[in-house]
A protein has these predicted regions:
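Conserved glycine-rich Rossmann-like NAD(P)H-binding loop of the short-chain dehydrogenase/reductase
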Residues: 32-46
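Alpha-helical segment proximal to the catalytic Tyr-Lys
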Residues: 125, 169-170, 241
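Substrate-binding pocket helix/loop in short-chain dehydrogenase/reductase
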Residues: 96-109, 135, 213-214
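Short C-terminal tail/terminal secondary-structure segment
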Residues: 1-4, 145, 233, 244-259
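Catalytic loop of short-chain dehydrogenase/reductase
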Residues: 136-159, 164-173, 185-186
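Short, small/polar-rich loop/turn modules that mediate ligand/substrate recognition or access, typified
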Residues: 172, 177, 243-245
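Conserved glycine-rich cofactor-binding loop
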Residues: 9, 14-18
Length: 259
């Protein structure tokens, strides 16, 4: 399927690896020029060069922490007249409710709520003026069904979801769509970290931890960055103009919900 977005310009946050990289690769395959961001320059530059070689698109890199004002300013400057924004950030660490204080919550809110909102406020007005734009926020399946040990993530990502629910309806009339992708377990560093915690807590091997988690997923496996990226690219396409303010689960059926 031709997604109809060749020549567009996309900002993809946290895109040196994992789900962000999957989104960047899928957009590049559709002919979209990229502004890629991550904190570490080495991995970011390597991923960007691989995408340039594979797809022949323009790729600008911004190695910066976008939870800071300096990092946000650098990314916004590089974005130019961006048509697409993919918000993404690593989740806060797991723990128990007794572990977290105000500083922990503020760090989670900065990364998983306030930074995406800042980038939306900076880039969406230009999209509205040009009468076309796409915003995809990568959140979590915990928005639909909270995960007890991920209380910081539950809170911050649900806050972003509430913001998007209202804002998406305000900008849709200008040709800008805004939606959220809610990943379940995918084969990423984040999954490795969570599985590693199970290994330590239960005294089992990593393979056993992964097998047990996969058994809780009706699809019987972890998701891949490639299939996640394909879903993101479709939401950014010309074909997705009537999808507004939605929370789309990509979890292999793991979340038990009717709606």
């Amino acid at each position: 399927m031709d997604l109809g977005i060749a020549g567009k310009r996309a900002v993809v946050c946290a895109s040196s690896k994992g789900l962000g990289l999957g989104c960047a690769e899928a957009l590049a395959a559709a002919g979209v020029h990229l502004v890629m961001n991550a904190r570490g320059a080495e991995a970011l530059d390597a991923s960007a060069e691989a995408i340039r070689a594979a797809y022949g698109v323009e790729v600008t890199t911004v190695a910066a922490d976008v939870t800071t004002q300096t990092g946000q300013a650098a990314l916004i400057e590089a974005a130019g007249e961006a048509d697409i924004l993919v918000n993404n950030a690593g989740g806060p660490p797991p723990g128990m409710w007794t572990d977290w204080d105000r500083e922990d919550f503020m760090a989670a809110l900065d990364a998983n709520m306030l930074t995406p909102i800042a980038l939306i406020k900076a880039l969406v007005p230009g999209m509205m003026e040009r009468k076309w734009g796409r915003v995809v926020n990568i959140t979590s399946q915990s928005v639909k069904a909270p995960i007890a040990v991920l209380g910081l993530s539950n809170a911050a990502r649900t806050g972003l979801t509430g913001y998007v629910a209202g804002t998406s309806r305000q900008v849709a009339g200008s040709g800008v769509t805004m939606n959220n992708l809610l990943p379940g377990i995918h084969a990423t560093d984040r999954a490795n970290a969570l599985d590693g915690g199970v290994v330590k807590a239960q005294g089992i091997t990593l393979d056993e931890a992964r097998a047990r988690r996969a058994a809780t997923i009706p699809a019987g496996r972890y998701g891949t960055r490639e299939e996640f990226g394909a879903a993101c690219a479709f939401l950014c396409s010309q074909h997705a103009g009537f999808i507004v303010g939605q929370n789309i689960l990509l979890d292999g059926g793991a979340t038990l919900a009717t709606i």
